[in-house]
């Protein structure tokens, strides 16, 4: 027998048709802070640290998907956009 165990199993974190939970905060760190600021209190784009006080989750999702003002749409899509909208809607 050989001494090398070269198994073909790779753990990708997802299996089958399951949707892995999206880390909304990580998406925000990757896609939002460059314009909205590290603490989301605004930079070249407005503050979104209290987005939930001004917008519903549905409104936030619409802005993420379609853009508003100087923000282009589609910076986050699908499950990422939905997770970020839900996360921001809790910020009040």
From Swiss-Prot:
Residues 1-13 have a biased composition (Polar residues). GO terms for cellular component: plasma membrane. Keywords: Cell membrane, Electron transport, Heme, Iron, Lipoprotein, Membrane, Metal-binding, Transport. It is a peripheral membrane protein. Is a lipoprotein in vivo. It comes from the Bacteria. InterPro entries: Cyt_c-like_dom (IPR009056), Cyt_c-like_dom_sf (IPR036909), Cyt_c_BACSU-c550-type (IPR012218), Cytochrome_c550/c551-like (IPR051811). It holds the Pfam family Cytochrome_CBB3. The keyword Endoplasmic reticulum does not apply. It is found in: Cell membrane. PROSITE patterns: CYTC. Heme c binds at residues 32, 35-36. Natural electron acceptor for a formate dehydrogenase. Belongs to the cytochrome c family. PANTHER family: CYTOCHROME C-551 (PTHR37823:SF3), CYTOCHROME C-553-LIKE (PTHR37823). This is Cytochrome c-553. The lineage of its organism: Bacteria, Bacillati, Bacillota, Bacilli, Bacillales.
């Amino acid at each position: 027998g050989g001494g090398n165990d070269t198994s073909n199993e790779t753990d990708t974190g997802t299996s089958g048709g399951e949707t892995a939970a999206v880390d909304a905060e990580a998406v925000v760190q990757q896609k939002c802070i460059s314009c909205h600021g590290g603490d989301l209190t605004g930079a070249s784009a407005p503050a979104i640290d209290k987005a939930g006080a001004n917008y519903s989750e549905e409104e936030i999702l619409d802005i993420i998907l379609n853009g508003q003002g100087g923000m282009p749409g589609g910076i986050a899509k699908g499950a990422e956009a939905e997770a970020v909208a839900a996360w921001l809607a809790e910020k009040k």
